[in-house]
UniProtKB/Swiss-Prot annotation:
Signal peptide: none annotated. This is Small ribosomal subunit protein uS19. The gene is rpsS. Protein S19 forms a complex with S13 that binds strongly to the 16S ribosomal RNA. Keywords: Ribonucleoprotein, Ribosomal protein, RNA-binding, rRNA-binding. InterPro entries: Ribosomal_uS19 (IPR002222), Ribosomal_uS19_bac-type (IPR005732), Ribosomal_uS19_CS (IPR020934), Ribosomal_uS19_SF (IPR023575). One of its GO terms (cellular component) is small ribosomal subunit. The keyword Ribosomal protein applies. NCBIfam families: rpsS_bact (TIGR01050). PROSITE patterns: RIBOSOMAL_S19.
Length: 93
């Protein structure tokens, strides 16, 4: 179920403060965040965010196409290395 329109998009307060501070200071350094649940707003376009995926920080550069999505959608948490059985079958043949 999607979020109600009357509530508006969710973004953590500390992340919005960091974004506005970087915007007024013309700072080009990446903004480090653990807030994967925050929605990407138009004010965030042009900035790079280091989004934590549970192990490392993944750099995400925000463009117009990212608006409306969550930050966590661009920092995958799982890595698929393949099924063990299929590799052994190829070697055995």
């Amino acid at each position: 179920m999607s979020r109600s329109i009357k509530k508006g998009p969710f973004i953590d307060d500390h992340l919005m403060k960091k974004t506005l501070k970087a915007k007024e200071g013309k700072d080009n350094r990446p903004i480090k965040t653990w807030s994967r649940r925050s929605t990407i707003l138009p004010e965030m376009i042009g900035f790079t965010y280091n989004v934590h995926n549970g192990r490392v920080f993944v750099p995400v550069y925000i463009t117009e196409n990212h608006v409306g999505y969550k930050l966590g959608e661009f920092a995958p948490t799982r890595t698929f290395k393949g099924h063990k059985g299929s590799v052994q079958k190829k070697i055995g043949k």
